[in-house]
Amino acid sequence: MTIRNFGRVVPIQIFLLQLVGYEWKGRSLDPATGGNARKRAMRDGLRSLQKSTGADFGYNPAAWREHLISTGEEAGYKHPYAFARVDQAVCKSLEDPTVIATLKELSESDTA
């Protein structure tokens, strides 16, 4: 699938972007604006990652990223078409205080 701001992505890349708060806006994936939209994207991303991989790292995108990279081509995360842009966006999101706070909140509330 071709996404305006990332190029040709594979589903697993979309799921990880959602987990770090990216949402669909037309034919692009952009950082969600607003807390509810961000939470919805993160929940959708987590469910999709769990369903696709059979693994569960919860709301820990760094652990998901490491897992997807370590599984190599099996997961498809490192597919070359969009990997560099997607991974850069994921890594940048891992340093965003808003993303970190929302992931922490979801981790605490969704498991309670």
Where are the predicted features?
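Extended repeat-based scaffolds of very large eukaryotic assembly and lipid-transport proteins
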Residues: M1-A112
